[in-house]
Amino acid sequence: MKCKYILPSIIVLVFLTACNHPKTGDSKQQTGLIFPHGKKITNNNFTGTAYLQTLVAADSLNSISVGNVTFEPGARSKWHSHPAGQILLVIDGVGYYQEKGQPKKILRKGDVIKCPPNIPHWHGASADTAFVQVAITGREKGETVWLNAVTDEEYRK
């Protein structure tokens, strides 16, 4: 019963706090966002520098995880998929999202992306602007399946 209120509450909290953040007038990552920057991601599933702040860890009561991910300019994930899908809430900056076989989408603050289950995709920052997203990932059907790195050619397309 309580679990069905967690996701809507997180979405409302994220958008209320993001909407109240003052503009600085430049395209660089803004400071003062509600969630901490997090720890540098040190695994090989990313190109460039990215940071993760876990907000909600999946457990026996709730099968979703929620994380705030900050990508420095040019940083991106590998191609990957999620057995139960994923939702991305864009908090700041300019980023990219691409599903295999589809054109790359440009993401900006306030955009929401629904990543379908088992569809290979990648996401990350634009070449010259940092990017911040909240990733909401279903874990009930398994963990993220990591694939190949996004090539520089794929990234530039």
Model-derived features with residue positions:
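Bacterial N-terminal signal peptides that target proteins for export
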Residues: 1-7
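A short, N-terminal "cap"/entry segment at the start of jelly-roll beta-barrel domains
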Residues: 20-63, 144-157
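Short acidic-glycine-tyrosine-enriched beta hairpin
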Residues: 101-118
